[in-house]
Every structure is written in structure tokens, then in C-alpha cells.
Amino acid sequence: MVELAESRFIKLQEELPRLFNRWIEKKSANPRWVMVIDLTRCVGCYSCQASCKMENGVPYEYFRTHVEVIERGTYPNVRRVFLPRLCNHCDNPSCVPVCPVGATYKREDGIVVVDYERCIGCGYCVQACPYGARYSNPETGTVDKCDYCLHKLSDGEVPACVSNCMGGARIFGDVNDPESPVSKVLSSKAVATLKPETGNDPRVYYVGLEEATKIGPGEAIVINPKVGGVIRT
Amino acid sequence: MTEKVITRRGFIKLGIVAGLAVAASATIGLPVYEKLFLKQVPPEKIKAIKERIRRGGVQVKYTACVMCAAECALEVWVKDGRVVRIYGNPHLTYNSGGAACAKAVSGLQLQYSPYRIQYPLKRVGERGEGKFIRISWDQAIDEIAKKLVEIKKKYGPEALLTDTGDVTDRDQYWRLTFAFGSPNAVEHGAICDTPRRHGPKLIVNGKRWEPDILRPVPVRMPDGSIQWYNKHDAKLIIYVGWNPFTATRIVWENIGTVRAKAENGCKVYVIDPGFSNTATLADKWFPIRAGTDADLFAAMLRYILEHDNPQDPNRQYINYEVIEKYVEGWSEFLEAFKSWWDKIDPVTGKKYFTLEWAEARTGLPREDIEKLAHEFGVMKPAALIWGMQSPGHHYNGYVASILGCVLNIITGNFEIPGGVIDTEIVKSSKGGTATGKQFNKRKVKRIINGVEVEAEQEKLHYAWYGDWPAAWDDVVGDLPRMIMEGITLKYGPFRGHKYPIAAYILRTGNTLVTAGPVYKFIEAFMAKNPDGTYKLELFVYIDTIFLESGLYADYVLPEASYLERMSLSDIYPTHPIIFLRDAVVEPLFEAKKPTEIMNMLAKKIYEYEMKEFGRSDIDPKEFWEKYKTEEDFVNEMLQVAPGRPNVGRPLPFPNQPEGYILYGTPESLDEGRVVIDHEKKVVRGEPVTVEYLRKHYGGTMWPMSWYRYREWDAEKNDWKSGGIITTKTKKLELKFHKYETYNKLVEEAGVIPLSWKVLGWEKLPLTFYWFETVWNYYTNPEYAKYREEYPFQLICARVHHAMSGTQMCEWLAQTPAEGLWIPLSEQFELKMAETIPGGKEIVNVAKSLPKNTWCIGTAQINRVDAEKYGIKTGDLIVLENPLGRKAVAKAYVCETVRPGVIRIGFATGGRFSPGLGGTYYHRLYTPNHSELVDYKLSPIMGQPCFADMIVKVRKTTIEEAVNMLPEYYRIQFRIEGVGTI
Amino acid sequence: MSEEENLPNLSEKEYISLLLFRAQIYSILRNIFLFEPSREYLNNLLQDRFLNKIIEVYPEKCLRDSASDFLEAVMEILRGGENALIDTWAEYTRLFIGPGPPATPPYESLWIDEHEARRYKGEAWLKVRDWLLDEGLILESQTILEDHAGIEFEYMMVSTIKAVEMLEKNDRTGFINILIKQKKFLEEHLITWIIKLCDAIEQKSHSSFYKSFARFTKYFIKEDEDLLKQILNNL
């Protein structure tokens, strides 16, 4: 019986996670974590939305990340777009200065976090965020938001929404590392951010955003599980 | 105390220490009653501990999902005996390199659902009342076994029909059924999409044709190494009635389509009455009329045949070499096909299969049809893929299936990189002798009209020798009639033999809701003999969750969930891959694994049979003495892996003979640790085992190759047809030799099956044939009279669920899809499976959810149609079919469905079992598609025609709706143990 | 405190003696931190005369003095009968266990400076646990953690004994490597907090047993750091 550790088939299997960017390979001395969402690859499966709840204990009524569905056009020239949304980990976040106890701050590595010990649950930051990325968790009495699954990052693993993404639409990595998946996407594709006019300098990029949010003729139908119902705009 | 100042050296030299306890052992200065806390352990153990710590005290295990038919490879994290995380397995390629969809993740909410069946239940009161009491396993097994033996005595063992429903790891139940003496074991395949698979079965003895977009695949390099081939080759994919982005059954088509488009500029066309999620990425959406796929394919074929020109590079559609060498019966097929070309179609007044004819039938502009035909002909490699909903659910789906295969074959796209692969004939085999099919070869005797007849047990089959001689995938849609009328065998040696369906074991299935019109099944399950006893004398329901069918069962047995049992994943890749479903946690409550249930029942049946008959068909050595654990069972199932021939290029194992069937681990085959049988042409390596799979991250694979329909013939120094093609002639058969067996059976008996007669057939035609679908006034003149009153075609489509057993999962109630599953719920209270901060585990809590926060099944309707009726999104409407059956739904008004079509999500509405948790609460204003389906079965295979129906529409109120729905929607069922945590 | 004298080259036997000496002391430190002292144990301390020898001839005055005080305290307890023993146990509990926060909890995590780490199972605990794992050691206990002073001392003890075994097998490299690791452990862990802990015990304890023990521990740790430095310089 050959030593299975030498099996070429096991070796092939061990190459796979690298091929699919499941792990954070190299860490530069000063990583800057950034996410790119490629809307041309999103298949609207909601895996990110559900995986995040599983990973971070987000209650049913709330979301750290969610996916909106936008339908536009007139039969048969119609379009449907899926728009995954999350905290944009802004460089100039409007949520940070409003905190009365200094419980929220932007880390060196770019992640905007909440210190749950300090947070008193006043909810000012929830209102201050133009993206509605935060929520008040009644279970914990604090606010909660995306933290790029920090607990996984420290183990060299990508956030749950990234590893479970069916279409490979969520790309995550260190923008200071030119070999990282995000750096490669950012240098080869046109990207845009949501609501740049807020001045928050959001650091979640989208490929194909213009196409998705283009105002065309006819109304748009928007379904947002965070809000419920069907919205016509 | 003196103050001697000495040096350290001096101190040591004084031998002070030497005089003390010098034993170099761990007992220095230790009081007798204490031992060391620190323990030295070997490096492997340290490695394992470090890995566990790295994941926070969590065990990482590999298993396979069951939340939909894709059965993806999972990596699950288990802590303190509970599953806390579900991810995709990144060490296998099957699901997008380790992705896991929302359904997979929501599996946590099925596993820890408050609505799981906790213990065995026995019915008290009438079937359908939903009144059960708790009983012990011993009592349940005892009573069921006793009853089964009773039934065997009265009618013969063939009176037992075992239906293992929607979940594929069912071999234990089939084995038990066959050993008991009944050949009647069926599963979901019978009601899935048999017409869709028909062409592949006839032509290549296969089943599912999928585009070659599974990447990466392992291929053999010229230097002998194996490397990942990660490049996409497809240039054009046409999805007809197939929606990989939502109906994730062949999961790798999901990311495969995305990547082929992004990395290889592959064009994607979606042909579907509804704008499916797959269409969001497509280069063009062709909103075809429902039920006209065959018409489209016929027109494409005619166009290709009429315009093909080998001299013109822009018209080189047909690959003549493939046809000449590897296809049987092409000229006859062509002749039969062409024989329609001059006929005038009474419905449209146009010649069959012309572009104008197709335009009139499909509702697509002729330029579009021409575009499809031309591009499919000229762009290579290309793949034409047709689906389950359509044509699989249409009466005439066979026609489309056969034409689809022909189109792929003659354009030279079959088995080429980026083309079309028949995944059934290249996937790894599994099951083998564990399934017990060998028991069906037993010789049995029956007395028929006073004459004793002896033949094999399988000749008693209720369908193959009953009314459906050609239904090789069995028939479940006809169960209601069969229960009411009983079985009379008409074919084979046992013809004339009669028996009832007296016992029905339904495992992980929900035929009441998924196999046809609900009321028909209820009627059959409730039917009584004159003496007041049920015609169906025994109904056993086995599952983890309590679905509608359970309401009519006599016994309900809790089966271990997919995370609690071991089996093999049933997958359809483009090359052999196999992975394990591992029991990662212990069964909750009193749930038992299938192997245990099989053994318990087998033993009790054995005991009763010995008492009753003095002998038993159950051999202890074939059950509990052989399978002490489920691992024993799965190891036997793995003996036949991969069971595929060493063919194609690059040749998977150049060191093994080409064309020989391979068994065993890829390592043993690779390294020559094999035994070769030159007579049987088999290479046997070391068998794959459960332990082996666990060491390989849960699964393993054998190399991919293409052109597997041919083998190199060394003698003739040329290619010959064969390889994976195991048809009679070893060629791609457009002369349908497969039908010959059935025609012979029918001829011998002199009885033509009713469903063939309706088509005007005395036997199955061995080449191209054409007939129309039903309930379709665009194609079948018989239905013209309904056009005005019932202006809508009703079709069913998919949302982020699968089968009918996941709709209690709360996270899936937040996944709006395609206008069919929309957050328009009323406010309600429920018990739910909820996560806690930090995601530490799933607990059960009671919550009140406000309006519009839970997705419900809706009826999707085009805006233009809605405006005619004054319907707006959220309005309650009633759908009524010509049979007077009704369903109620909230409307979703949009632009993303063809006018004249109404679309409903499968199993999204009218769910009247409390086991459906939150979805149960909305049953009164959500549509159950099965209420509107006709009891109409397609010929040949007896598939229910789920997609053939027409309806009329009007607005209604909730009061009216409540009164017009059948009673079982209004009852508030409370099932013992279900939802009572 | 340390003398300016360097340790010259020793013979193999002498190294072994030195190692066993160190192991013996670590064993005492380990026992006193991990368990309430039994009468039997205290008697052993007296009778095996190990401490007496130290008092008589060890070059370092602080060590001699604190050992002397410690032995005195031991004798006092033995003379004091049952009550004295029980008082000692009560003191052990008050210092190291509870109820409520113990006066001087013997866990490295709680004595390290960074304010986030000041909790049980903090950064320091993580490091010690990983250190032990790298040495192939796991802690089998439901009630104490790896960064307990007694466990850290147990580690020093068992690794010293291992070093003896290496020498006896003539595995010089193995022997040196262990000493290198021990020096690192001392510097990165023991030195950083044991002194603080011992100062606190000295300050807060009412019992001369624990006060003198704390002093002895403190001085020995410093001494051992020195010893190791000098041994390694020669090798």
C-alpha cells in the first residue's frame, strides 16, 4: 500500500483551494483588505447572504450582507440584475465619528469594526451609514456589521460569503499585494463604487455596476429581502 | 547557617546533587499522590490537535449535501457533536471549487428544525386527519413486519411497492424490497423528467446531456503526469427549458456557464417562456411558448439539413465523418424526418418544420429561429441542452429529446471538448450488489388461471409487465389508478396474474404533492373496500421531515438526516468522481439510519415468515449478519467504482489496456496494482473504501477524456465505435433498437398498451416520430376549443429550493427568485431554527414575523395581461383549469414572463403539512401547482405532464379563496412531536 | 545578584548533576503552586535535606536566605499541628483560587501588560499552549490552563529531565537545543511575570510559608536565567 501522503491524486486535490482563491496565501506586512463584487458573475443564489448569517450569528430579521434583485425593461427586452451589498469599509466612514463612546473605528488593515465591549447600542451609527450596512442586534444589545469575518482572516481563510459564492463573484484580498485576486481584478477591469457622492470613499468595488444600475426606460422593480415586499421605482 | 562562599563550580563539584535522588526519571521530588499534568504525545496527534485548535475546537468533516439533487461536496464543521458550519468542499471540483449555495447552508435549519420528526408515530383516526400517537421503534417495526407478511400471504410479496422518493441514497430499502420478494421498487426518477432523458437512452444508452463546462478536470499529460485542465472550450450553449442558476441540479453548470462566458467568450442563449435567472447572463432570451421545444428543434434540424454546405465555411454545419462511422440508422431517420416536410399542419396551415411553421407554433420570430439554427450549426464547439421542466414535463417530450440528441450529434458536438457530454455513461458506478437487484433473478412460481408458471421475480413488475411495458424508469404518476384498480399483468410469462398494491412504503418522497393531482392521490389513499378497510392496506412513511404524504400514512418513522447517515453522493460529472456522504453527527431524537431500519425490518420479517411459512425469503447473511454498520454497506456499494471503460483521449490510464472496464482506486490503477481479466476485459485495482475516501478529503476522481464513444482497434489500425456506448450495435443508434425488446413483449402478448394506442401506434417506431403535446391549443387542434376561455399556459419553474422538503428552512425564505418566490407574506408567528450571536449553534425560538418578510409562492404574470384583468402585484387571484380545479395566489406582475403564460414555483405554495414550518402558515393564499395538474401521463414512460395545462384567471378575495380550496388546506394540523420543541 | 564568575567547562557528569539540581527545584516550585502542601510532602522537604544543602552551600545569598526562611516556615507548620496545616491550605486557596477573584491568580495571561490580554486564556495563554504543543506536550486537565505557574514550572522540570536523558544518550545537540529552548521560555515567559507574581504574593500573603516561597521562586528564576546563559556560552 503506497503512502497515501505521496498520492498524486491527493496532491491534485490539495492544489484546488489555491486554484479557487479559497485561502489567503501571502500576507504582506501591511495588508489592506478590499472586496470586489463582479456583477457579471453573480448568479443570484443568495449564498453570501445565508452563509454570513450562519458564520456570524445574524438573526433572521437582520442582515450583514444581502442581495437585491432589480428588474428593468419592457418585455421582451428585459434585464435582471443581482446586487449583493454589504458594509463598504469606507476610508472616510460616516459611522465612526458619530459614535459617542468611540466603539467603532477603522483598523490599519482597512476593516471598520465595532468593539462590542464598548458599544452601548445607541444606534447612531446605524442611522449615520448611508448604505444601511449596520443593524442593532436585540440579542446582544450592541450594533453589528460586516467585519470581513475577522475570525477567519486570522486563520488565513477568506470570509464565508467569499468561499461559498457560487459564481465566484465575490473576490477578496489584500490590495497591497499585487498578486492577490483583488489586485488582479482591479488592474484589469473597470470598477465603480456605490454612492460615491456621499464622500465616504467606499472600498467595496463593483464590476459591471453601471450596467446594473443604469436608468433605462420603464420602471424598475426592486426586491430587497431586507425590506421585503416589491418596490417599484 | 554558615556563610560559605563557594563558586558554582565548587558547589557542583561537591557532588551535592549527585547525592540526591539521581534517577533520571520523572519522579524527582514528586509526592506520591500526584502525577504529571503534561503528557508527551506523538507528532501526528499534535498535528491533529493543532488543526482542531486552529478551527476553534472544531472537527472538520467532509460529506455530501441533500438539500437539492445536485448533492454537492461539503466541508462541515462539527463542535461538541453539533454541526456549526457548512461550506463547500474545496478539495473536490464538483461544486464550483468549494462553493455552497444558500440551500446548502440552510441545511443547518433542516438539521435543527423544530419540525423534524422526533419519534415513530402510529395513526389513530382516519387517514388525512393528522392524528398520531407516539410508539416505540420496536412496536413500529413489529407491526409493520407483521402486516407485510400478512400481505405477502394474501397476495404475494409483489403487493409491496417501495417508493424511495426524492433522495437518492436508497439502496437499503430497495435491497429489502427485492429480498422480500417484490420487484416493485421505484424512486423519484419516475416522475422527474423521463421524456427529457429519452433520446439519450435510446441513442447512447445514457441519460443526461450536459455542456462540457466542468472545470478544472484532471487529464493525463503526454509525460504521464496528471494535471488540472482549467480552460473553457465552449463557444455556444443553448439552454432550452433549463435553468442552472436556480435549478442547480447539475451544479457545475452554474459557475461553468459564468466562466465559459467570461473566459472563453462563450455565447449563451436561454430559451424559456420565463426570464429565468440563467437568462440574466444570456446574450439573448428567446421567450418561447410553453410546450413547443420539439417544434423549435424540428425547425432547427430542417434548417440545418437544408442549408448545410460542406464547401461553404459559413455553412459547414454537419460532421459527416461522425455520422458515417459512429451513427446507426441515420438514413432511415432522415427519411422519416423528411416524410413530414411536405405535409401541411392543420393548426398553422404551414408545412411541418419550416421556419414559418415554427414561428407560428413557438411564437418566436422566424429570424430568431433561423439565428438559432445557423449559429448552432456553424459555431463549434456548441451544446444544445434541454431541460426538466421542458421538454421533460411535456406529453411529447420524447420527440424534443430525440431531436436534441440528433442536433448535437450531426453537428459533431458529442463528446468533444466544449461540446456535449452524456454524464450518465461517464460517471462513476456505485451500488453494485448492495442494491440487491440480484434477488430479482430468483425463480418464483405463480398460479395463473389454474396453471403454474415459473419465471424470474422481476417479471412480476407492476409496470413493465403491467400497463407500461416500455417504462424503464418505472411509473409513479399512475399510482392512484393502480391502487384503485389493482395490477393485472399483461406481458411476460406471468401475464394474467393479478395483485393489488396493498403496501406502500414511501421514503423521503412526497408523492401526494409531487407526482400529479393531489386529489387523485388522496382519493387512492382513502379508497375503501366494501368492508370498510383501506384498499391500500399499509402505508409507511419514512423521512426526517413531515411532509403532506405523511398525513395519510399509517406509520411514520423518523429517518436520520443526511448529516446523520452514510451513503454516496449521486452526481453527474463529465468524468468519474465519487464522494462520500459521511455521518458527521449522531442522529437526533429517535431517528435511525437507513441501514438500521433495513436490518430491523429484515429481522422482524424473517421472524414472522419463519413462524408463518417455516421458511423466509430474507437471508440473515444478506442483512444484519453481513452489514453490522452502514460503513459495511457503503463499502459494498463502492466495489463497482468507477466501472467505466479506459477510453477516450487523452487515454486516462495509458498503462492499462484500452477499452477494458476499470475498477478500483485511481492510485492502484495508476501504479499497476491490478489484476487483469482478459476474457471479461476488466481491470481490477484496489477497491475504493470509506476509509480511503476519508483520507482523500471525502472523495476521489479518475481522469477526464473526450471522444469516449470510440476505441482504438489495434487489429484494424483504426477507430471503432464502442467505449462508453453500450447500445446493441455499440454505435449511436438513430435506429431505436432499444424499443425492440418492448415491441417483442407486446407482440407476444397481443395487447397494445393504451398509451400507445392513443397515438395510433401498434408498436414503438424504430426511427424518427412526431406527435403533439396535450392541453396546448397552439400545437394540438384537439384543444382549440379552450383557447378563448383559458387564455393562459400554466407552467412550473424553480426557486431556491428543491423537491418539496426544504421549504421550512428560514434562510431560504429570504431568497426571492424569478417572480415566483416573493416576500409578500402576511404577518405570522412561528417556531423557527435560529442562529445565536457568534453563530455558535442553531436553537429553536418562537418569533413573530412582520408582513412581507417571508417569501411565498406567487403567480407570475405579464403586465400586459395583468392590466386586462386589473391585477396588480400582491392582488389575490384564482387560477382555474378546464377540469374545474383551482389554486389561489398573490400575483407578481412583471415584464419577465411571456404574455399568455402564468408561472408558478414548484412546491412553493399550498403546503398543507405543519412540517413545512413557516411556509405552512401561508397555505391559504399561495398556489399548489399540483392542484391544477391533469391526471395525464405521457405515453411510453408514464411521466405526469406537469407542464401541459391551461388556466383562466380572475381576482378574488381571501374569504372566497378559503372557501373554494379543498378542506385539507383549512385544517390546522397538529402532529405529535412535530414542531413541539 | 549574580556573581561575576563565569561557569567553566563541566564534565558530562557535572552537567547531569546541574540539570538534576535544576529539575529538583522546579519540581518544588511546581508542587507548591499546583497543590496545597500535604503533611507528607512537607516532611519530605525536610527529610531529604535538599533544601538544607542549598542553605548551606549555594553561592547565591538571596537563594540561601529565602530557602532558609522557607524551611523555617515549613518546620513551623509541622510543629503547629492540624490547624497550621489547614491555615496554609486556606491561604493557598485565597491566593490562587478564590472564591471571587483570587488574590494572586497564578496565570500568566493576567499579569502581562497589554490591557486587552488581561484575561484568562489571553494572548499569553495562547502562546504557552502553542509552545507546549510544539514540544509535543498536551495538558490533560479539566481545571487548569497551560499558563498556570505550576504548569510552566512543570514544563521546565520535564524538559530538564529530557535534557539529562539526551546527555546520557550522548545526544549533545539535543541537550543543547533543550537548554536553548528553556532559556527562551524563561525570557519570553517566566521572567516576564513570575517576578511580578511573587512580589504580589510577598505583599499580599499573611503566611510566611508563601512569602518566603515567593521570594525563593523569584530569586531562583533569576538565577536560572543566569545559569542557562553561562552554560550555553560555554557550549
Name each model-derived stretch.
Chain B
Residues H394, P594-Q656, T665-P666, L812-I981:
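Long, contiguous, secondary-structure-rich segments that constitute the structural scaffold
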Residues G165-D166, F376, V420-G431, R615-N635:
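A glycine-rich phosphate-binding loop feature that marks nucleotide/adenosyl-phosphate handling sites
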Residues E537-L538, A583-A602:
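Phosphate/diphosphate-binding loops
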Residues A282-P287, I577-P587:
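Short beta-alpha connecting loops at secondary-structure transitions
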Residues Y173-A260, N264-Y269, D295, C405-L551, ...:
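Extended redox/cofactor-interaction regions of prokaryotic respiratory oxidoreductases
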Residues T2-D312, A336, G450, I505-R507, ...:
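N-terminal export/assembly segments and adjacent metallocofactor-ligating motifs
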Residues G265, Y269, G274-M379:
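Long, well-ordered, tryptophan-enriched scaffold segments
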Residues N277, E548-L580:
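Flexible glycine/proline-rich, aromatic-decorated loop/lid segments
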